[in-house]
Each structure stands twice: as C-alpha cells, then as structure tokens.
A protein has these predicted regions:
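An acidic-aromatic substrate-binding cleft motif
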Residues: 99-170, 174
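Amphipathic, alpha-helical segments enriched in basic
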Residues: 83-85, 138, 186, 193
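Short, charge-rich amphipathic segments
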Residues: 86-94, 126-146, 197-207
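Short, flexible coil/linker segments at or flanking structured domains
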Residues: 7-9, 94-98, 134, 156-159, ...
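Aromatic-lined carbohydrate-binding/catalytic grooves of carbohydrate-active enzymes
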Residues: 146-228
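Short C-terminal domain-edge/linker segments immediately following a structured domain
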Residues: 28-33, 138-142, 176-180
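N-terminal accessory beta-strand-rich subdomains and adjacent acidic, glycine-rich linkers
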Residues: 1-132
Length: 228
C-alpha cells in the first residue's frame, strides 16, 4: 500500500522490483497470456515475459514468480534483471494511484519441491486476493469448456453434440462471432462473422436453443473494446 498523504494523486510510471538467484538458472517463459512457454536461461532472457514465470533452482527446488490482487493497476511483466542472475518487474503502463486506491498488487514468490506442486498450491494465489464480494453466487456454475472454432451453425451443433456426449458443460464462442475483435466498429449486439475467421453462416439464436435442448451452456467472448 502507498501512504495516501505522501503519494496523493501521483502516477507510477515504472517499477524495478528484482528477484535474484545465486546462479544462472533454467527458466520457462512466455511473452503473452495463453502463449506457449519455452525453456531458456536467466542470462538469455529477451524482452518482457508474462507471469507466472517458473525458475528451476535445482532438482528439488522450483520457484514461480507472479502477482495477485491486480485491481485498477498496471499489469506486471518480467524482464532480465539489470544486475546478477534474475528478473525484474516492468509495468505494462502507467498507474494512477488515486484510481488504484493507493494499493498495489501482491508480488509473490512461490516455492515447491517439484513443478506439479506449484499447480497444487494455486490456492495461495486465490488467498492473496480479496474475498468474493458477490452475495449470491448460486448462478455461477463452474464447468469444463470447449471452444467452437468453425463459427458456423453446422459446426456449432456438432461441437454441442460432442460436449453433451462427453459431459462438457459449456461451448465457447471466442473472437470473430460479432466481427473483428480489434475493430472498434464491431458490434457485439449483432452476430456478424469476421470474414477473416469464417465464411459462416452462423445462426447463434438457433445454436443456443439447440444447446439448451442438450443441456449444454453457451459462453460468448466480447473484447473490452466493444464494451467501452
């Protein structure tokens, strides 16, 4: 947290929190969310990596570096440290501390004896976040999801059949069902297929009705640009 009196209406433009190791360790990095991870060394890092970043200290010690409780604050990425073997934080944009409530996200270091334990310890990240503020959560129904990629009526129904046969709760329509996701002119209140992704046709109301008859839920993705 920032002292409100000392940092009144300030803007944070940079951060260089360092995480240093005693030697040049093996690490696994990706440069984007949902990207593929690749193996490299701390000394060979290039550009900014997304978090979490995993570092192998030795055969019995693995470290994951990341952040939690990210609210109204710039996302942290990790780049090669300016000194020693390690990484340091870099912000993806400026931070208005008044908007952020004079609070920063957690920067965490998770340690485990093997990589699988890092995944098992994911409750650690959950507990660093504020408790749920939604009083009635009965409408939230977690479940497995499969993405529909053809953006056609026929392909969607086939995907729904597969989901129903394999007890998959949801079918997801990702980018492209209402136009090009990065185009601010794309209207998420319409079904307008992005021609770069599919030739269609996609009758989404008909697909949703069919999914309901099969007991399968439908999720639709909307880029934040269409919500502004």
């Amino acid at each position: 947290a920032f002292d409100k009196l000392d940092f009144w209406n300030r803007t944070v433009t940079d951060e260089k929190t360092q995480f240093l190791f005693q030697k040049d360790c093996k690490t696994w990095v990706t440069d984007m969310a949902q990207g593929a991870y690749f193996e490299t060394k701390l000394s060979a890092l290039k550009g900014a990596a997304d978090r979490p970043q995993v570092i192998r200290v030795n055969d019995n010690r693995f470290v994951a570096i990341g952040e939690a409780a990210l609210v109204d604050y710039s996302r942290m990425k990790l780049e090669k440290s300016e000194t020693g073997f390690g990484v340091q934080s870099v912000l993806s944009g400026k931070v208005n501390l008044d908007l952020a409530g004079y609070r920063s996200p957690w920067r965490y270091v998770m340690v485990a004896g093997h990589p699988g334990k890092l995944v098992e310890n994911n409750y650690f990240v959950l507990n660093l976040n504020e408790p749920n503020q939604i009083a009635n959560t009965s409408w939230i129904k977690p479940g497995q999801v499969i993405r529909e990629v053809t953006l056609t009526t026929a392909g969607s129904m086939a995907c729904i059949d597969f989901a129903a046969e394999n007890n998959i709760a949801y079918v997801l329509f990702d980018a492209g069902w209402y136009g090009a996701e990065e185009d601010i002119k794309s209207d998420a209140t319409t079904v307008t297929i992005d021609p770069a992704r599919s030739k269609g046709p996609l009758d989404l109301p008909k697909v949703i009705e069919y999914a309901d008859s099969k007991g399968v839920g439908i999720l639709v993705y909307v880029n934040k640009k269409a919500l502004h």
